[in-house]
Structures are given as C-alpha cells and as structure tokens.
Amino acid sequence: MNGTARFWALAVTLTGMVIGMSGCNQLLARDQLNKGCDAFKAGHYDEAIEHFQKATELDPKLPMAKTYLGKALEQDVAPGVTTPENLKIANQAIDIFKEVLAQRPDDVNSMKEIAGIYFSINDMDNAESWQKKVLEVDPNDPDAAYTIGVIDWKRAHQNKLNALQAAGINDDGKGNVKAPKNVMEPLAQQNAPLIDEGLKYLTMAVNDRPNYDDAMQYLNLIYRNKADVDYGNAAAVTEDLAQADQWTAKAMDTRKANEAKKNQGPGGITIDNSGQMH
C-alpha cells in the first residue's frame, strides 16, 4: 500500500472512530439528561445540576439540556436575597438561558425564566426589560403584562411610602387628601408615568385572561395609587377609589369562581372546602 492509500485508510478509520465516539457521547448525554430529570422531580436540585451539566458537556446540542440546567440552577436562587452567593447562582442560571436564546432567539420561555430570576433578586429594571421582550414575541402574554404592571405598582408604592414617611404621615390608602401640597404634588409628578404604564399593562393582562384575579387585585391597588396622583382633584380621586372598590369586588368574585371551577369533579359535581359533594 502506497503512502496516499495508507493516508486515506487511516483517515477513514479515524473518521469512523470519531463518529462512533460522537454517537456514544450522545447516548451518554441522554442518560445524564434522564438522570437529571429524575433528580429534579425528586427535589434533589444539586444532583440534577450535576447531571444536566454532564449532559451539556457530552452533547452541547442536546435539546432541552441547557434549559433543564437553567431551571435546576434557578431552584437554588433564594427570592429576595441579594448576597453575593445568591446573586452568583442567579447569574449562572441567567447566563444558561441566554445561551439557549443564542441558539433559539425567539424562545419565549427562556425570556420568561430570565425575567423571573431578575424579579426574584429584586432587579426590577432587568425584570421589566425582559418581560417587554416577551411581549415583543407574544403580545398577548397575560403574565408578562401582569408582571410589568406589578413592577410599576411596586415602584410607585415605594415612592409614596418614602415621601409620606419623610413627612411623618401614614398612608391612608384613599388618596391622602389631607397631606400637604409640598409632599403630594412632587409625588404626583414622580408617580404619574408609573401609574399610567401600570394601568395599561394590568388592563392588558385582564383583557388577555378575563379570569385573572391577581391582575384585578393589582388594578385595585394601582387605582388607589392613582388617587394620590390625582391629588387636588376631588372628583378624580372619588372616581379612582370607586374603580379600586369595583376591582376588589371583581377580584373576589373571580377568585371564588376560579376556586369552584378548580374543585369541580367529573360530571359537574362540585366539592366544597369540607370535601362534601354537591
């Protein structure tokens, strides 16, 4: 066999070995993925993380492996905790979901996961930004619209508490009409854009999901903050509070209807809180 023939024979042999190793790695990766899923379902998140990491190393193109890894990491993120260790885990999970988006730019679920992680570590700017990315892909997503409305309410409410507490005033939840102008007028200017946006997105959420009782409850809350923005306009304040009361009542009725539907058994049988069938 001449040199050229030997070269091609060796090349074919090596190619076969590489293909064989690649196929073996794919099988091993799927095995690690399955083990990770089992650990995740059992609540063993650290073990699941190890399996999902091995799966992605063995087969970087394995569908869902990185998504599952991001979800497992997310379980270790403590909501509301901003310690360096917790933020490190949160950012690891976020980076994994961003890697998924690099391969699938319109993966709305990864966008939602990123937004949710940012929300859980109180990074509201990024949480809102990513929820708006969700709405760019799916304009009718009620949860994204709801979350943006909640963020706007949280900001406006905190602004109000800061202003009132600095003046030694307790929030009355009814527009604080007795508070002085030098407190309420600057607050109204500060909060007006937040209230407008919050109302817009919470209304979108309810329109897209008519039984969204949580969004209805936040409409109640944001109308109460709108009463502060309408300081000095008695008719507007009265209307804001009436709207708040209406949304409270609607939220309660809708929640009851949702619970009744949840407890409804086959054939229209309803199970009450005591377990009795009707």
Positions of predicted regions on the chain:
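C-terminal motif of bacterial Sec signal peptides marking the signal peptidase cleavage site
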Residues: 20-23
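Bacterial signal peptide processing site
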Residues: 25-27
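Short coil/linker segments at helix-helix boundaries
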Residues: 29, 46, 74-99, 151-204, ...
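Alpha-helical segment of the N-proximal tetratricopeptide repeat
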Residues: 30-54, 58, 79-83, 184
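Conserved structural position within tetratricopeptide repeats
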Residues: 56-57, 95-102, 133-136, 204-207, ...
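Short coil turns that delineate tetratricopeptide repeat
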Residues: 60, 105, 139-140, 210, ...
